[in-house]
């Protein structure tokens, strides 16, 4: 595991401990279980695939540890509206505060501004965060295989599914993919960014794609998609679902950038 990932996960453990003291799990769990406003995240991507068009999970991200501030003029609601108006299937919103300058309030604002299903993009290390995700309105959570053992992967997936949420299981190599395929979720993300070196290679998705397809799962390529040629390369290989953030966040109109990239 990389130093940066270890650092982030250690921070998350501290944050959850503080959050549990501030608000007991029982209270949070009640809020999560009583929300009835779930939006079909996996279904939105499946409908795009059935229609023969790319299913884009458009990301709302202010900053990252590797790039610093990506979008100084950061208005989550306006960005969400722009994405929704230009063909995004779903949204991804960073809620990590320390490393990505995200916030739960950003997810709430983005979701309130449109009708798209929303992924909570964060580093989950505790069941508390799964209930927290649904309580804040998330329709999908991210489980990073590199960050979790098999028991927690299974537990967090089960809780999410009981709450009606979809689960995007993120992998980077064959060993992680093998572990991801033990779960029930149809959504398999392939992060083209190596979390150990932060280098990006689209070959990562292409190398894992045959196994994902053979298992009847949906491959979602993440990171490094920045040009129409990248999109063409992926689609010709059979990838129909994309998670893209930075390429849009650096443009004045993120939605217009989405429409151009996937024209």
UniProtKB/Swiss-Prot annotation:
This is Indole-3-glycerol phosphate synthase. Pathway: Amino-acid biosynthesis; L-tryptophan biosynthesis; L-tryptophan from chorismate: step 4/5. Keywords: Amino-acid biosynthesis, Aromatic amino acid biosynthesis, Decarboxylase, Lyase, Tryptophan biosynthesis. The keyword Transferase does not apply. CDD domains: IGPS. Its EC number is 4.1.1.48. The keyword Amino-acid biosynthesis applies. Pfam families: IGPS. It is an enzyme of class 4 (lyase). PANTHER family: INDOLE-3-GLYCEROL-PHOSPHATE SYNTHASE, TRYPTOPHAN BIOSYNTHESIS PROTEIN. GO terms for biological process: L-tryptophan biosynthetic process. Belongs to the TrpC family. InterPro entries: Aldolase_TIM, Indole-3-glycerol_P_synth, Indole-3-glycerol_P_synth_dom, Indole-3-GlycerolPSynthase_CS, RibuloseP-bd_barrel. It catalyses: 1-(2-carboxyphenylamino)-1-deoxy-D-ribulose 5-phosphate + H(+) = (1S,2R)-1-C-(indol-3-yl)glycerol 3-phosphate + CO2 + H2O. Signal peptide: none annotated. GO terms for molecular function: indole-3-glycerol-phosphate synthase activity; phosphoribosylanthranilate isomerase activity.
């Amino acid at each position: 595991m990389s130093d940066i990932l270890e650092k982030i996960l250690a921070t998350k453990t501290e944050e959850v401990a503080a959050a549990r003291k501030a608000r007991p799990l029982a209270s949070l769990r009640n809020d999560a279980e009583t929300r009835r406003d779930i939006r079909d995240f996996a279904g939105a991507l499946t409908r795009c695939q059935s229609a023969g068009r790319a299913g884009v999970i458009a990301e709302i991200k202010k900053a990252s540890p590797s790039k610093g501030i990506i979008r100084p003029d950061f208005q989550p609601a306006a960005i969400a509206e722009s994405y929704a108006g230009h063909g995004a299937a779903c949204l991804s919103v960073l809620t990590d505060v320390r490393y990505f300058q995200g916030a739960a309030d950003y997810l709430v604002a983005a979701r309130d501004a449109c009708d798209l299903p929303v992924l909570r993009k964060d580093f989950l290390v505790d069941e508390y965060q799964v209930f927290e995700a649904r309580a804040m309105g998330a329709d999908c959570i991210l489980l990073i295989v590199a960050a979790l053992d098999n028991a927690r992967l299974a537990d967090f997936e089960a809780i999410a599914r009981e709450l009606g949420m979809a689960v995007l299981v993120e992998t980077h190599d064959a060993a992680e993919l093998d572990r991801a395929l033990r779960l029930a979720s149809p959504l398999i993300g392939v992060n083209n960014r190596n979390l150990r070196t932060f280098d990006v290679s689209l070959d990562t998705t292409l190398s894992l794609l045959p196994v994902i397809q053979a298992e009847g799962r949906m491959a979602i390529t993440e990171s490094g998609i920045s040009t129409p040629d990248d999109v063409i390369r992926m689609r010709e290989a059979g990838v129909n679902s994309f998670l893209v953030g930075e390429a849009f966040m650096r443009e004045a109109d993120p939605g217009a950038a989405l429409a151009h990239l996937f024209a």
